[in-house]
């Protein structure tokens, strides 16, 4: 466990708004594009996790939104969710960059918008980055076709950057498609694996909450490590090279706030007071 004051170590505080998080993601994208264009070693297939608003709050309020920060209640389904995500990408993540929104990857690929980033003709190298939103287990087949170059060969170049925003595939692709689609699942496990550095999450801003009700903010900005900040965002309570587990996050937040784990987390209910300990 690492605990340190931001003032002493010049660690940038977490974003205070959703638009602020999207602007930070833009800065990370700039670093990645510059590194890739200069042939500096950097990940080429990456993920960005953008926070999304809760329907009952101001659209720029950065608040706890359930597991992995992606459990907002969207009455309009993935279509509504995509419209909000697209707005953040257009207004902040790609602000100032030469880019073109190409539409949905396929008419059946719900929520999978595609952007080409960068200019120049195909002979001059074409665009250097492709952004895709919301690939999921049910739509990963379309995403695999994109990676294979069926929608354009630029993505197959070794220095082409592919950025996935708010991905939804399970684990390392083992639940893609239908159970009988053995070939698709085998391909997905090879291409979508997040093990050994695959599809590194280069940006994340997520409000977290332990079962005891202690909140904090989890952040990652490539090439920096993962940092978990306390409720007020003035102290780093956990720092790791890899994305911390939910248990690590909860234990760090509870320890910093000097509270115990809620009943049902890793203690028996008979050992706690129902008045003081509530399962959330």
What kind of region is each of these model predictions?
Residues 1-143, 149-158:
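Positively charged, amphipathic N-terminal segments that serve as targeting/anchoring signals
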Residues 45-49, 129-133, 161-164, 217-218, ...:
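Ordered hydrophobic segments in well-structured contexts
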Residues 137-138, 147, 154-194:
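Ser/Thr/Gly-rich flexible loops in soluble cytosolic domains mediating phosphotransfer, phosphorylation
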Residues 248-280:
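C-terminal structured domains
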Residues 173-258:
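A conserved mid-domain beta-alpha-beta active-site/ligand-binding segment of alpha/beta enzyme cores
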């Amino acid at each position: 466990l690492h605990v340190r004051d931001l003032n002493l170590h010049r660690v940038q505080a977490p974003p205070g708004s959703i638009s602020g998080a999207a602007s930070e993601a833009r800065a990370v994208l700039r670093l990645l594009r510059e590194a890739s264009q200069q042939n500096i070693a950097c990940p080429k297939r990456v993920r960005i996790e953008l926070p999304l608003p809760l329907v009952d709050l101001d659209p720029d309020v950065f608040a706890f939104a359930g597991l992995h920060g992606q459990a907002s209640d969207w009455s309009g389904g993935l279509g509504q969710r995509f419209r909000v995500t697209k707005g953040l990408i257009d207004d902040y993540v790609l602000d100032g960059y030469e880019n073109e929104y190409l539409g949905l990857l396929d008419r059946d690929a719900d929520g999978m918008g595609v952007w080409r980033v960068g200019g120049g003709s195909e002979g001059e190298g074409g665009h250097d980055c492709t952004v895709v939103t919301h690939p999921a287990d049910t739509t990963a087949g379309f995403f695999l076709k994109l990676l294979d170059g069926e929608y354009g060969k630029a993505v197959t170049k070794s220095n082409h950057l592919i950025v996935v925003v708010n991905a939804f595939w399970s684990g390392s692709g083992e639940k893609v498609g239908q159970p009988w689609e053995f070939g698709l699942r085998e391909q997905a496990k090879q291409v979508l694996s997040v093990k050994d550095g695959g599809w590194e999450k280069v940006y994340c801003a997520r409000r977290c909450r332990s079962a005891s009700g202690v909140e904090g903010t989890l952040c990652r900005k490539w090439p920096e490590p993962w940092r978990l900040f306390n409720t007020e965002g003035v102290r780093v309570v956990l720092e790791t090279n890899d994305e911390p587990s939910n248990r690590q996050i909860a234990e760090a937040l509870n320890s910093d706030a000097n509270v115990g784990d809620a009943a049902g987390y890793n203690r028996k209910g008979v050992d706690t007071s129902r008045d003081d300990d509530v399962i959330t």
